[in-house]
């Protein structure tokens, strides 16, 4: 099993990943903001993303690890499923109990949980997860999918998303989490197995 896994999210600070070559297995989320060499898979959790792929408006790179909503989309669109079946590495349907429902479990959560639970990584690097640190939900994926980023939705999303990270850090207490960001003023309490690497351009 891999010692280190890098999950490349779609927030502004994902760019720091590109500064130098990185050792370890790489997972992307939806459509990554740049090309990732030696990528293990792209993770997809959204019904909307599958619809955009089906319409020919997006083409996530590499093989795909898909969640329950993409699985449902494939079941209800069998021709589409046949067309993209060679791209699907697997359907991964696990969800931790601290994610109340699948809509609270975003693509970053999904990719991280897959790396932890399925791949059994010992160290997990998180790049471009700006919403843990700042009130910033800008995402490269928004260029592909029209997302509601209004103030009420921003508040709801950060209220739902951040507690899941806290629970995940506790759940996998023997894993070292490395959060890469432009500052260390994180908005949640973090346990001893989580450290912040402050990156500069």
How would you label these PLM feature ranges?
Residues 1-201:
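Metal-ion/cofactor- or nucleotide/acyl-coenzyme-handling active-site neighborhoods
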